[in-house]
């Protein structure tokens, strides 16, 4: 589960959304260590049973989050990971379908759009049971960038399309507390909208590359998203 999986598990523990969480990793000792470490924080949040297990434990789960996959290396795009990560999915998903699992399958690995489709095809589950994280992280990054000038919780804007280099911001629907973003900027004395929007979009699109170059992987943002 490594960085992304462990960060998501930590975020879920803090939210107290579940009464039980099982961690599965090819390195079982790693999953055990993460479960122990997370469990030691439970006195400060909601009661929850966190433990390391294997696929026989997932039959009664309401939600399975798959984060397994090769990480982007500096200079790689998400699409460069397709062959490796589809291969990993092919080793994981059949172990899930072999159980009586009837819950939701969520994919949080790259390239997430391709892998979500692959997971649905491999599993045979109906499309309404297989989801990907999509552009939720990109949307959070956009709201953060705009929100550096205001409270980001007041910013309403979305990124659509691929979670990757072809993603697109929907500026026409962007607003701050219900005020159209362009109008809001003019009220604050800022009129160079197009140049600023293009710069913000590029910062959002390229932010993963910037983070990977500096620390090797991204995981906190997607865990919160």
Predicted regions and their residues:
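N-terminal Rossmann-fold NAD(P) dinucleotide-binding loop
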Residues: 5-6
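Aromatic pocket-lining residues of Rossmann-like dinucleotide-binding sites
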Residues: 12
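Conserved N-terminal Rossmann-fold NAD(P) cofactor-binding segment
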Residues: 20, 24-62, 76
């Amino acid at each position: 589960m490594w960085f992304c999986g462990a960060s998501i598990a930590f975020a879920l523990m803090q939210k107290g959304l579940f009464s039980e969480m099982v961690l599965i990793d090819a390195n079982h000792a790693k999953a055990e260590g993460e479960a122990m470490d997370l469990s030691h924080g439970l006195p400060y949040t909601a009661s929850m049973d966190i433990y390391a297990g294997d696929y026989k434990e997932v039959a009664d789960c309401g939600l399975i989050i798959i984060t397994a996959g090769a990480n982007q290396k500096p200079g790689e795009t998400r699409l460069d990971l397709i062959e490796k990560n589809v291969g990993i999915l092919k080793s994981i998903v059949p172990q899930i379908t072999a159980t009586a699992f009837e819950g939701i399958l969520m994919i949080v690995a790259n390239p997430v759009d391709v892998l979500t489709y692959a997971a649905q095809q491999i599993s045979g589950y109906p499309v309404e049971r297989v989801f990907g994280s999509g552009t939720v992280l990109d949307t959070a990054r956009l709201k953060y960038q705009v929100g550096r000038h205001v409270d980001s919780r007041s910013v309403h804007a979305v990124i659509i399309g691929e979670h990757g280099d072809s993603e697109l911001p929907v500026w026409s629907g962007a607003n701050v507390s219900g005020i159209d973003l362009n109008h809001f900027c003019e009220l604050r004395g800022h009129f160079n909208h197009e140049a600023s929007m293009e710069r913000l979009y590029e910062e959002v699109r390229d932010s993963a590359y910037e983070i990977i170059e500096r620390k090797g992987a991204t995981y906190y943002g997607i865990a919160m998203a």
